[in-house]
């Protein structure tokens, strides 16, 4: 990893998210996909995923222009050695991070790289996400947790658009999705929610409860459609008008999150390469 001094720009810099507990459900920063499957092949989704290391923080991001990646704000410390590698394999080379721009209120950050990516970049999903839509989560958490050399992906079904989730930031507006064929466990923070191969959300939190088998079976995503103007302003990315309207907002404390049945980790790895059970 290259050593780099980078600058952080924001209207306000808030503390990184920390684990929170509450009856029935708690949400904490999401970190690795376990019991999932490899992100493979040459495609927009595999080519645009980013492995981020800034200070002692390991996260995931997504290339949305040749020089800009989007991730979660809580992934960005105030200083430290900063590097990013583009692509779904650890064979990808790290490059330094030039700067990070933090969203003033949402758990979003933009990370600028000095060299243009030669691989694909991903477009934003062209509509506001609605309950019942299906997508894929992807992330690099398995690299730190299990030594997996390939980014992992699982399936997500959006359940609700929520606020007041038991977490450090109860004002956050989030897409709540149940995870199947894998689960979020610690490095996937900031990773993408893809719908039809386009970026619909950025992972902010996942379930963190007393039963470890339930951890990571629900993820909360920042809906990028609701922040398209901010993204376009700083990156220069052309974003077409977003279709539809945001889904009804549900109070997640008054209407607690349903946590799916446990999904214990049953995958394995050979030589560091992940082998999912599905």
From Swiss-Prot:
InterPro entries: Peptidase_S1, Peptidase_S1_PA, Peptidase_S1_PA_chymotrypsin, Peptidase_S1A, Trypsin_dom. The active site is at 74 (charge relay system), 123 (charge relay system), 189 (charge relay system). One of its GO terms (molecular function) is serine-type endopeptidase activity. GO terms for biological process: proteolysis. Residues 33-236 form the Peptidase S1 domain. Coiled coil: none annotated. It comes from the Bacteria. Residues 1-32 form the signal peptide. Gene3D superfamilies: Trypsin-like serine proteases. Keywords: Disulfide bond, Hydrolase, Protease, Secreted, Serine protease, Signal. SUPFAM superfamilies: Trypsin-like serine proteases (SSF50494). One of its GO terms (cellular component) is extracellular region. Disulfide bonds join 59-75. Belongs to the peptidase S1 family. PANTHER family: FI18310P1-RELATED, POLYSERASE-RELATED. This is Uncharacterized peptidase cgR_1176. It comes from Corynebacterium glutamicum (strain R).
């Amino acid at each position: 990893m290259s050593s780099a001094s980078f600058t952080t720009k924001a209207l306000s810099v808030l503390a990184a998210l920390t684990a929170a507990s509450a009856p029935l459900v708690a949400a904490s920063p999401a970190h690795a996909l376990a019991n999932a499957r490899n992100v493979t092949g040459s495609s927009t989704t595999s080519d645009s995923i980013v492995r981020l290391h800034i200070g002692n923080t390991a996260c995931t991001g997504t290339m949305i222009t040749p020089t800009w990646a989007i991730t979660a704000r809580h992934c960005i410390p105030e200083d430290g050695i900063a590097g990013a590698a583009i692509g779904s394999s650890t064979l990808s080379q790290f490059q330094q991070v030039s700067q990070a721009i933090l969203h003033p209120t949402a758990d979003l950050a933009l990370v600028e790289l000095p060299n243009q990516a030669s691989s694909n970049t991903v477009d934003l999903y062209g509509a506001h996400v609605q309950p019942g839509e299906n997508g894929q989560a992807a992330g690099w958490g398995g690299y730190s947790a299990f030594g997996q050399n390939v980014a992992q992906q699982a399936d997500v079904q959006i359940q609700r658009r929520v606020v007041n989730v038991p977490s450090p930031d109860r004002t956050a507006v989030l897409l709540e999705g149940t995870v199947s064929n894998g689960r979020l466990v610690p490095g996937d923070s900031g990773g993408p929610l893809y719908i039809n191969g386009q970026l619909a959300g950025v992972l902010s939190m996942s379930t963190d409860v007393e039963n470890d088998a339930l951890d990571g079976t629900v993820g909360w995503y920042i809906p990028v459609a609701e922040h398209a103007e901010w993204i376009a302003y700083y990156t220069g990315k052309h974003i077409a008008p977003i279709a539809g309207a945001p889904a009804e907002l549900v109070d997640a404390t008054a209407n607690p999150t349903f946590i799916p049945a446990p999904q214990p980790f049953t995958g394995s790895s050979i030589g560091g390469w992940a082998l999912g059970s599905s």
